[in-house]
Amino acid sequence: MPDEAQHLTAAKPDSAAGAAAEPAAHAQDGGGPVEHDRSAPADKPAERTRPKPAPPERPRPPPPRARAAGQPAARSGGSSNRVRARLARLGVQRANLTHPVLEPLLRIVRANDPKIETSTLRQIEKAYQVAERWHRGQKRKSGDPYITHPLAVTTILAELGMDPATLMAGLLHDSREDTEYGLDDLRRDFGDVVGLLVDGVTKLDKVKFGEAAQAETVRKMVVAMAKDPRVLVIKLADRLHNMRTMRYLKREKQEKKARETLEIYAPLAHRLGMNTIKWELEDLAFAILYPKMYDEIVRLVAERAPKRDEYLAIVTDEVQSDLRARRIKATVTGRPKHYYSVYQKIIVRGRDFAEIYDLVGIRVLVDTVRDCYAALGTVHARWNPVPGRFKDYIAMPKFNMYQSLHTTVIGPNGKPVELQIRTFDMHRRAEYGIAAHWKYKQEAVARASKVRTDVPKPAKGKDDHLNDMAWLRQLLDWQKETEDPGEFLESLRFDLSRNEVFVFTPKSDVIALPAGATPVDFAYAVHTEVGHRTIGARVNGRLVPLESTLDNGDLVEVFTSKAAGAGPSRDWLGFVKSPRARNKIRAWFSKERRDEAIEQGKDAIARAMRKQNLPIQRILTGDSLVTLAHEMRYPDISSSDAAIGEGHVGAQNVVQKLVQALGGEEAASEEIDEAVPSRSRSRKRRSNQDPGVVVKGVDDVWVKLARCCTPVPGEPIIGFVTRGSAVSVHRSDCVNVESLAREPERILEVEWAPTQSSVFLVAIQVEALDRSRLLSDVTRVLSDQHVNILSAAVQTSRDRVATSRFTFEMGDPKHLGHVLKAVRGVEGVYDVYRVTPGPQP
């Protein structure tokens, strides 16, 4: 297996099924993270019609099994049992001929439990028949029959090793909501357990996840889970298949569902210990929300995989050799790397991709807990452990009952190696989580079936069964006993960028706040006026300072002032955590300190103009400011100045709009040369560098390339006569063309006529995963392409994405394509494109 993530394979029926009379399933293949589809669907991506179907037909019994000619009568004992078993399997195969599309699913079911009863398989087939009949005529967004979706979901459940009741519920999970097949009918046909599961999934589908999830929403999920955790397993399989087949939805809906998957379903799979599902959900959602970063990480992984695999093979061989010498039976494999986890480490830990991906991880699986610690000692005897990196999750399991030994050692060539050591049973739980309970039972039967029947088998002790259920019971008890859903909500992480705390009002209402919130945040969450007038607080009956940090379960009461002039303090902005409180405080000062903001706005405009050497008195006229204020949808000049002073509008943006209203910088200041800057920064009216443009019908005219759109040869252009009697050349699609067209008499026809001395301005934007020496590498590549960099601006966002903008001179615009290609080859760069320095939105 390659060292990359290997996802569950989706239900992909045999090709023969597509030609069968019954509708064939066309579920997408999950594959590895490179292969799976990046597009993605809603939870119910179907255009459903609701015809009234006939009642479902009962499956026909298998034909009687006739004894072949010459066949001796069955003898009693083991021989007769084997004959009956063969005939039973033959009957199942014959029965399956009615629905060949079911064969891939039933093949997995029989592999999980070779001794499964024929009647149980018939019940699964019956569930398919009922679902197919009630969904007949309904279509998914892809145009496929809707039955392909529940069939694919059920195949995922079968791969998880779920029991027959869960498989039947998977086939029927949409029947109650989308058809007239009622709960009473379902219970009559398939029993109370299947009815309970389908009803639970239907109720869970109605839970709406808002931006700030309420405690009641979380309680609904816990209640649904407490009744039977298989409800959530079905829901996760449902979401996984929808994520695999989301490309048929509109982009906006894809992103909405992908974000919901990252914030709700992937953390939920993590809470249930179902890491196999969690990893694939994260990678699929990551590919939809951040496609460029996803593609770049995929490319970087593919680039480094050969060397990493070579080093991994060396480490694996040495570990296996040492364990073999100690007579410890073990399986040693490379640990998968998942694209979203790589991305998260880049963001959260601020580490370079090379540092993350080159850290090799291996997994050691053994038979017993004693062997786990023996293997740990063996590894530490060969390589020195890194202090502080050992974790014993066997003695102290995680919240989802994850158990393993974690250690990091200094491996060959001085490189760190991460190891996870656990038993096979622990690994099963780590991969499948809550689903491992059912998978464990199925695999135990499968192993038993391979033992010779004439050899006595040890009886499974009563305590073994109780211990097997203890993990499931402990997880459910933990959920039931958590009256305050804060801890559960923290695990779901409705906002991945922060944790939350839950506090109570004096009336016992629950208020959700960011971690580290204060009584001031609480006050603004209750009401804006309560926040503005807050003067003190009491937490759990004790007076506390307003900057005190609140914890889960705190009972908070605030005191307010009735004075007419009561208001917030600017100091509060230094410790409040919630966006609501911060925005409300700023809004108050925006209203109450209007004069101060207006003065700050005026000063900001003046500073921006002085920085560009622009004539302030000429530009800042009353008419121009009033016109601009109205264009920006402010009632007057004071309002626009206040907006600038408060930081709502950039001063540079306002100055640029004022200059453009006067016809550009060349019109605003005739003394400032607006031609493309030469290396000597000449201020002469005629630069030595020819702009390479001629005006039709006019000779000896001063021609300049407009900086607002920086046209280059080959692009459609127009000329505009400025107030300085020069001709400013713009691209035909320039953002300023609309305003220029208001004076058609000043527009001239121009055309390109570049000469050897022509030089053009080009601005490009580079987007990359942030790392050390990134700027150095990009500028080196630009220098190698023989372009003259005039300016560079770099900023890094909180998600560790570096955005760089470079402005440079070049003589041949055809060379731009080579420049962009060279920059795109820099490690970590996932997008580079030309930009125009037009007005900022």
From Swiss-Prot:
Chain spans, region Disordered: 1-82, 669-691
Enzymatic reactions: GTP + ATP = guanosine 3'-diphosphate 5'-triphosphate + AMP
Biased composition (Basic and acidic residues): 34-60
Biased composition (Low complexity): 10-27, 66-75
Domain ACT span(s) in chain numbering: 763-837
InterPro entries in alphabetical order: ACT-like_dom_sf (IPR045865), ACT_dom (IPR002912), Beta-grasp_dom_sf (IPR012675), HD/PDEase_dom (IPR003607), HD_domain (IPR006674), NT_sf (IPR043519), RelA/Spo_fam (IPR004811), RelA/SpoT_AH_RIS (IPR045600)
Biological pathway: Purine metabolism; ppGpp biosynthesis; ppGpp from GTP: step 1/2
Annotated keywords: Antibiotic biosynthesis, ATP-binding, GTP-binding, Kinase, Nucleotide-binding, Transferase
Biological process, per Gene Ontology: antibiotic biosynthetic process; guanosine tetraphosphate biosynthetic process
GO cellular component: plasma membrane
E.C. code: 2.7.6.5
Transmembrane residue ranges: none
Residues of the HD domain: 146-243
GO molecular function, one term: GTP diphosphokinase activity
Residue ranges of domain TGS in the record: 499-560
Function (record text): In eubacteria ppGpp (guanosine 3'-diphosphate 5'-diphosphate) is a mediator of the stringent response that coordinates a variety of cellular activities in response to changes in nutritional abundance. This enzyme catalyzes the formation of pppGpp which is then hydrolyzed to form ppGpp. Is required for actinomycin production.
Protein family: Belongs to the RelA/SpoT family.
Protein name per the record: GTP pyrophosphokinase
UniProt organism field: Streptomyces antibioticus
Gene, per the UniProt record: relA
